[in-house]
Amino acid sequence: MRIKCYLLGGGTNGYLVWDEQSREAMFIDPGAYAQAIADDIRKENLTLSLIVLTHGHGDHIGGVPQLRAAFRDAKLAAGADEAPLLADVDRNLSRDICGEAVAPVPDLLLKDGDTLTLGALCFRVLDTPGHTPGGISLYTEAIDDGLFEDDEYTGTLFPGDTLFHGSIGRTDFPGGDFEALKNSVRAKYYTLPDDTVVLPGHMGGTTIGLEKTQNPFVRP
């Protein structure tokens, strides 16, 4: 597995993830700069099959229309419970964040336990509400061999804005729920192996083990 992180508008992290053998790829949370993302996908000779949204806020969806136009065969996937927020340009904050209304309609509505595949790679969908009502995360037992050359890590989690290095996502936006977020972290993240790499929607990476011992907002 290979992963390329993009620093997008508003300090959002977007991730291009692909299987090295098949060259099949997905992009997680294209918040902006869709043209630059598309150029990189073509430069790497990748086939973009999936665009995945961890949640529906404008800083994570702003580039969706342009990226879908550039790769018409790519399927847009989001949590099934996130569809109402995606459709509501006031609640998804796209006007405030993107300067225009963005309301993408997913092709695939994902639920807890669903799986997504890229070549030989398999990603498990985790329902992780709290930051938004229908937020999801992706977990895979694969790691990026180029970034992590030893055997220290055994999996990768993409939590969107639910969990950060030493922090958690905001719950004061429409549909946010602090108790639901804490439950998502404890039930879905803290049950993963401690050596799972966490690549969040903002700020730098961390591990599950580090957050379990040092995150002041959610203790196991």
Model-identified regions with their sequence ranges:
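Conserved beta-strand hairpin/beta-sheet module of binuclear metal-dependent hydrolase folds
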Residues: 1-44, 137-158
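Short, basic/glycine-rich phosphate-binding loops at helix/coil junctions
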Residues: 16-22, 85-86, 92, 162-164
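Residue-level marker for buried hydrophobic side chains located in beta-strands
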Residues: 26, 52, 76, 156-158, ...
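Short catalytic-loop micro-motif centered on adjacent basic/acidic residues
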Residues: 26-28, 50-52, 125-127
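Short secondary-structure boundary segments
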Residues: 30, 55, 80, 161-162, ...
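Active-site HxH/HxHxD metal-binding segment of metal-dependent hydrolases
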Residues: 33-117, 121, 141-148, 213-217
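Metallo-beta-lactamase
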Residues: 91-92, 122-220
